Amino acid sequence: MGIQGPVLLLLLLCVMLGKPGSREESQAADLKSTDIKLLSMPCGRRNDTRSRIVGGIESMQGRWPWQASLRLKKSHRCGGSLLSRRWVLTAAHCFRKYLDPEKWTVQLGQLTSKPSYWNRKAYSGRYRVKDIIVNSEDKLKSHDLALLRLASSVTYNKDIQPVCVQPSTFTSQHQPRCWVTGWGVLQEDLKPLPPPYHLREVQVSILNNSRCQELFEIFSLHHLITKDVFCAGAEDGSADTCSGDSGGPLVCNMDGLWYQIGIVSWGIGCGRPNLPGIYTNVSHYYNWIETMMILNGAVRRDLALPLLSITLLQAPWLLRPT
């Protein structure tokens, strides 16, 4: 073949180096330090507000600046949390019937779930959703988390800030200073949140999974308590979440920063003794969150396909008899 053989091998080598898998890896490496900033600072910071007592009470403006209201056709549907200027974390079951991103908006920076029509500040903190990414790694398990990619970049201020996220090596158990927030109903009988529909907060304790499995064994649901979820609340039922809180964050204070540990997922009733709420374990899905943000953070042309086309077109000439 003369010199044509080495040329062909060189082109084929270029194709292999440019294959889609390696493109994703190089994309991940490039974007980790630019578009994603999942662990970048500052995060998990909030206004200095006086601590409140435990037990399902109204919150204060700016106390949980990462809190998001996911709105379906202009009405609050689920909670969520701001991870970065373009990404919101929430529960997958919120989109069981409504996966069209055009039907959703995300409200940030508001204490109420029903801001006044004349509240211009509320509209400046409302963002359209570009993509809804639901975790579907294993259909046999819940994997109850989803990412929303916003159509435009969020403007940070004192009332809008991202929450921190811990990597997969983090353990959520034995965290004493944890809170969950939401606009859900107040009781199991669906007693609605009264005007002015302010965000509520409650301090919760995280149970170890073996204890949680014991509590849910009576309903034959103990097999659902695996490493991708955890239980939190109060065993006497005094601290819990309910309908409308789904997708909202459970956060813990560590060294002065707030980290999201869980996502409100499911439970049996609301506030029942010995039946704590079930939360998606965020750190368990850290790698999935990071990967989805990287792969959807920026779209680059895949050079492997046109390069492969050139190689194949030139192959007959390169291999022709000399």
From Swiss-Prot:
Residues 53-294 form the Peptidase S1 domain. Testis-specific. Expressed in spermatogonia and spermatocytes. Expressed in Leydig and Sertoli cells (at protein level). Expressed 2 weeks after birth and remains highly expressed in the sexually mature testis. Expressed in the seminiferous tubules but not in the interstitial tissues. Expressed in type B spermatogonia and spermatocytes at stages between preleptotene and pachytene during the spermatogenesis cycle. SMART domains: Tryp_SPc (SM00020). The keyword Membrane applies. It is an enzyme of class 3 (hydrolase). Keywords: Cell membrane, Disulfide bond, Glycoprotein, GPI-anchor, Hydrolase, Lipoprotein, Membrane, Protease, Serine protease, Signal. A lipid is attached at residue 296 (GPI-anchor amidated asparagine). It is a lipid-anchor; GPI-anchor. Glycans are attached at residue 47. Residues 1-19 form the signal peptide. Coiled coil: none annotated. Disulfide bonds join 78-94, 178-252, 212-231, 242-270. SUPFAM superfamilies: Trypsin-like serine proteases. N-glycosylated. Its EC number is 3.4.21.-. It is found in: Cell membrane. The active site is at residues 93, 144, 246. Residues 20-52, 297-322 form a propeptide. GO terms for biological process: proteolysis. One of its GO terms (molecular function) is serine-type endopeptidase activity. Belongs to the peptidase S1 family. PANTHER family: SERINE PROTEASE 41, TRANSMEMBRANE PROTEASE SERINE. This is Serine protease 41.
